[in-house]
């Protein structure tokens, strides 16, 4: 039984991943009709939220029929992410999700999204600060590592759990792979089978 805080997702939950320019309200409504157990908004820039940018604020709109639903944020600065998480909480989502997986150059090369996989201590610190800043359950979406030499996801997942996240979604590729090659589900399984892990672990990549 998958459970995030007090949210019961059943035995084999299907999640709608947060996708920029895809996971908007009409698409979410369609996915909900077809059985999505948990959905997320498009990712939202932490800097955009704290600057009250219209495009970012508009993505906070969620509807009762969508529940349970999470709002996802991304950013490179701990203070901005902490403040953005608090803003998200005011929109009353069920979950606040942190994007540590976006591989796109304009995001990752600024240290946000998958870019933070090059600085695991910062990733852990940022997560801890966000968890402390909000009352809603915090989840994370990330990748196996930055490249083939840094696939530290088993250790990283455990460290993120230790600072308070309540679920983790893992894309079975590195940032260097982008969306090429095949997703490595064996490493996702290694996280799931780690006896020290007790939070839900969701797999992402090549799901069909």
Region annotations inferred by a language model:
Residues 1-208:
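Flavin-dependent oxidoreductase catalytic cores
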